[in-house]
UniProtKB/Swiss-Prot annotation:
Protein name as catalogued: DNA polymerase 2
Catalytic activity: DNA(n) + a 2'-deoxyribonucleoside 5'-triphosphate = DNA(n+1) + diphosphate
PROSITE patterns, A to Z: DNA_POLYMERASE_B
Lineage: Archaea, Thermoproteota, Thermoprotei, Desulfurococcales, Desulfurococcaceae
Source organism: Aeropyrum pernix (strain ATCC 700893 / DSM 11879 / JCM 9820 / NBRC 100138 / K1)
Entry keywords, A to Z: DNA replication, DNA-binding, DNA-directed DNA polymerase, Nucleotidyltransferase, Transferase
Amino acid sequence: MKGSDATLLSFQLLDVSYEMRGSTPVIILWGRGADGSRVVVFYGEFRPYFYVLPDGSVGLDQLAAMIRRLSRPSSPILSVERVRRRFIGREVEALKVTTLVPASVREYREAVRRLGGVRDVLEADIPFALRFIIDFNLYPMRWYVAEVREVAVPHGYSVDRAYTLSGDIREDETRIQEDPLKGLRVMAFDIEVYSKMRTPDPKKDPVIMIGLQQAGGEIEILEAEDRSDKKVIAGFVERVKSIDPDVIVGYNQNRFDWPYLVERARVLGVKLAVGRRSVEPQPGLYGHYSVSGRLNVDLLDFAEELHEVKVKTLEEVADYLGVVKIGERVTLEWWQIGEYWDDPSKREILRKYLRDDVRSTMGLAEKFLPFGAELSQVSGLPLDQVMAASVGFRLEWRLIREAAKLGELVPNRVERSEGRYAGAIVLRPKPGVHEDIAVLDFASMYPNIMVKYNVGPDTLVRPGEEYGEEEVYTAPEVGHKFRKSPPGFFKKILERFLSWRRQIRSEMKKHPPDSPEYKLLDERQKAIKLLANASYGYMGWPHARWYCRECAEAVTAWGRSIIRTAIRKAGELGLEVIYGDTDSLFVKNDPEKVERLIRFVEEELGFDIKVDKVYRRVFFTEAKKRYVGLTVDGKIDVVGFEAVRGDWSELAKETQFKVAEIVLKTGSVDEAVDYVRNIIEKLRRGQVDMRKLVIWKTLTRPPSMYEARQPHVTAALLMERAGIKVEPGAKIGYVVTKGSGPLYTRAKPYFMASKEEVDVEYYVDKQVVPAALRILQYFGVTEKRLKGGGRQSTLLDFMRRGK
């Protein structure tokens, strides 16, 4: 303990930032105390630094002197010291350069790079605040005990107490198993903006309503007077301050709500100081908006990883997850907001729509945040950034932390073109319907391959290096070699991940599945699994700091070899293999033979394998990665069929799924045909909801830059002409209208078309029938029969024909 006024503070770390006090950077740790108070801890002794890797052409002392001469009064170079580190597995001597102002690091980096004798400048692109928590081994969402001195809360800060860090800070081991979200204040919000048939402009279009809700509280609506929204935005600022949330959740607020509110507030002269410091939200890492002292979490970032949901609207995602069903809520299109605001008889519907949006947002937060909190703890990225970052970046921040512990210098990110290499083995399936099929899953195959064969950029044998065959592992097919010892960077990290996950799964067995303890541990093991499984793909990712194409090639080669060996053994056991895909095998469910195969894989090959699921019935086409299956618990899996993937309407997707369900559950092809005929009849009678006819496709570049004429581009151009802003990455929804011209000439934005304009026969001929036939054609069903005529058949007929 340092000094008589020092005290111990137990607090949960929520976020980290820094501010400049004069020319001195001060780290800010935002958290909550064990007594529920909101606290801030300052530390002004940490300084930014980077490493210089010499090329050997100049003496290290001479190079250090050259670097010192670059020092500038605005941010002096405080020290240049010689250090020993490792870089891609090799011992190196480097220079650690420390300066004063974080923003000057990039400038010094460029100046140092121009000096003779410099091979590279490393770790100059790591943000200062993240650098601090990496070096001090602090993880967001975890609890810590720190030696602190209490100080007065500085002007402009909205916290209960403030401290300066005066001594050690260590993890509070008594709270490791505590739910990180317990006791946190969560607030959901959504805004409605006035506009009619064009992109809203914050310079002139008002924010007419803001809905917000504190977890467990009532939904509140702040409403403009006519179109005067100054009081609405000012009222929102005051409500955020009074609720004082630790976590603010929204849906797409990083891309729309925050930028709009920030700009609109400036226009109106309102200070949007919604954080715990008197500053407005600022754009931060990975496109998220930083709200000082609060975690601003965009739930759309979580939804982006729900590959089963094609169109990621709030309504669709909330419906899919059972939070708020579409049929139980008000649904409006963005372009209807102005109309419903202007009509007093419709304004209550608009209020209900906003309430439903806020309710859906809070419901999604309850679903998503537990995983996000655990992923934040595992990766080391704050909760508001962790899902905004791609999985590669999430893993990389954990790797950077591990590198710091191991004395490894972090490589720079280098721009590379997308490389290609042979992927996993995929067997051609045995087409037809198969009953009682077990799916065997190789648990974490690729991370385990990396551990077993010590795969990594630091263990890769480079051209010109000589090692005996007994000293290396040689990958089949590709021939890449990896040193058996010492353990590589990735092996050390993955061993920790895999061991950590095994311990958690063992601990889970001590708790009932519906208990809070089990659920917390389950989210934690999922977060660890996500990062561990990302490691192989990461090495082949062009943006990776630890990029290694040979490593990625070797891992997939070993994966193919393991699958082939398992298939050969299955053949020897008389176990029929129906299909194989990446890290799984589909086999006839003969329990005794399946058990013998599992034993062989575990004991002879050294890999974990388990029965992942059993299909009561599964149907394969002749194509790879394309099947539909009915599990023993009644769930339908549809994999690889066009309506699940490409430019298909929701109606086509629904039809295909229902056809699969009928065929697999009832065995009656005729019942499936009748279902399709009924859909066609409803279409022609105008009884299908127009929203189910919308086809969605993403713009990859500005509409005017497309050379080929495509339907979604035509729709985007029509939107632009109507004053609606469209940018690359936007999902364009269109319907096909009547007419005789090419398809692209008949595409129209769905909100600009009437139901009467829709070309029903296009949807019959090019959507519903093809989607259904992708399955039914294998049972002898033709397009003609779907549209009328033909005999009854059953699944049994097809199975007999296949014998």
